[in-house]
């Protein structure tokens, strides 16, 4: 059950959602635009909402930021759980249910291409900071390649071909590539009798550089990882085990990566987000309803603490699972899945300025580059809420597409799991 718990807690919340599919009566939200004060002019931007379908292929909804309207709907594979936007190569989606990755142009209603993976791969995560490459994290066993562990595959984005696949640990749940094409760090939930490990891979060859275990100073139950802006450090969120508390481990990359330092977190940390504008790291602590905020510009593993906290943990709503900051540096937004709302927090005073009611079970939040809109996916509410930042109110609620294409009445809806913007 420990491994299952970690998988469900994996933010991005694809796996949080999977535990809730098919539960209860389905609420069917309707788009309800609210006219904002004076309008909010902006450049052309889009938000891409990933929808899970328990009864067929999933989809991606593309929303025009300027009009809060659906521009197009693209079909994905079976069981889509994660999406990644590569500026030069479009949007990629990991389809765990049929061992594929979908790709389509991000700026137009273009054709969807499909990259096939090895049978049994069950892709769950995507990452890349290296032009021309997309790394796919596969949680399943592949009899012809990795019959007793997970794996990482490298897709050459120009051709859509898988160039290499390498074995990692058991039940990998998350990974990150260090900035500027650095090493790849894979979090394996099933290793060491469920205590976890981190596999460090060469990004060119996918050869294993080192495996970091609890005996090397790694905290128990690693669940999420984020790279520093310059790639010097990898920040790994570990949940602990009920006896050992959660912690933020700071890892180095290179020929001999190590767990260089660690700082305590709140109870039940699940997710981290790097605000590249202010160079801050945010960690959601779902167990005690707080967010930890760190100064990621001032990391020194020889100091105590090795990464300074900018405030006491910020008390937010119930069960925070997602966080994102405005590019203008004024506020950050926290999705609280247990209280069905979003906390709006000042980036200077760290005071909660407002609590915004959204749909049921909000799990993921993203801001668009113009800092005018915030997008919140509500998987149990079958909707996406759009918050207008001029007054921090919900301007529009967009219903998810029907599970059965073409359905027009009393339709069961798909379930939005995450959103990315450009």
Question: Locations of the language-model features?
Answer:
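C-terminal motif of bacterial Sec signal peptides marking the signal peptidase cleavage site
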Residues: 18-22
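Bacterial N-terminal signal peptides that target proteins for export
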Residues: 1-11
């Amino acid at each position: 059950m420990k491994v299952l718990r970690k998988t469900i807690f994996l933010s991005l919340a694809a796996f949080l959602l999977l535990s809730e599919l098919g539960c209860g009566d389905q609420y069917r939200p309707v788009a309800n635009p609210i006219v904002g004060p004076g309008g909010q002019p902006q450049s052309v931007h889009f938000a891409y909402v990933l929808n899970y379908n328990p009864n067929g292929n999933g989809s991606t909804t593309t929303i025009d930021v300027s009009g809060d309207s659906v521009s197009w709907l693209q079909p994905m594979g079976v069981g889509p759980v994660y999406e990644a936007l590569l500026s030069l190569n479009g949007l990629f989606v990991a389809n765990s249910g049929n061992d594929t990755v979908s790709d389509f142009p991000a700026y137009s209603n273009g054709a969807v291409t499909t990259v096939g993976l090895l049978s049994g791969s069950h892709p769950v995560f995507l990452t890349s900071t290296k032009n021309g490459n997309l790394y796919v994290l596969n949680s399943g066993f592949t009899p012809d390649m990795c019959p007793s562990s997970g794996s990482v595959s490298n897709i050459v984005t120009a051709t859509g071909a898988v160039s290499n696949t390498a074995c990692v640990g058991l039940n990998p749940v998350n990974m990150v590539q260090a900035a500027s094409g650095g090493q790849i760090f894979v979090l394996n939930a099933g290793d060491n009798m469920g205590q976890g490990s981190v596999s460090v891979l060469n990004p060119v060859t996918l050869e294993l550089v080192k495996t970091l275990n609890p005996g090397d100073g790694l905290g128990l139950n690693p669940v999420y990882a984020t790279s520093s802006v310059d790639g010097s450090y990898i920040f790994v969120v570990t949940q602990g085990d009920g006896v050992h508390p959660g912690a933020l481990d700071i890892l180095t990359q290179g020929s001999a990566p190590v767990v260089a330092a660690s700082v305590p977190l709140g109870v039940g940390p699940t997710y981290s987000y790097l605000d590249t504008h202010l160079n801050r790291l945010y960690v959601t602590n779902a167990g005690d309803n707080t967010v930890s905020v760190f100064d990621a510009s001032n990391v020194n593993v020889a100091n105590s603490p090795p990464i300074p906290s900018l405030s006491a943990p910020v008390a937010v709503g119930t069960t925070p699972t997602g966080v994102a900051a405005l590019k203008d540096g004024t506020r950050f937004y926290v999705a609280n899945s247990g209280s069905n709302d979003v906390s709006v927090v000042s980036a200077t005073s760290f005071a909660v300025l407002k609590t915004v009611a959204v749909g049921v079970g909000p799990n993921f939040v993203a801001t668009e580059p113009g800092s005018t809109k915030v997008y919140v996916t509500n998987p149990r509410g079958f909707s996406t809420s759009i918050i207008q930042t001029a007054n921090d109110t919900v301007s529009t609620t967009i219903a998810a597409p029907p599970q059965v294409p073409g359905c027009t009445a009393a339709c069961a809806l798909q379930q939005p799991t995450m959103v990315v913007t450009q």
